[in-house]
Amino acid sequence: MALHADLTSLSSTLDQMLERLEAAATDVRGTDRDGLLGDLYEIERHLRSANRRLSRTLTAMQKPS
């Protein structure tokens, strides 16, 4: 199922993006760019929400219809 494989790949990409975003937040915390943290955390929140939704979709795709 090509769609399932594509969505699984997208989920992995989101996981990698979240890791990089966490690293970026760590890098700016306590610096003169500390003001970016609110935006970075908001982006993280949306990406986590999208990843959860994608995970539910992948689970639903595996159930027989």
How would you describe each model-predicted region?
Residues 1-2, 61-65:
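Short intrinsically disordered terminal tails
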Residues 1-28:
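N-terminal acidic leader/helix
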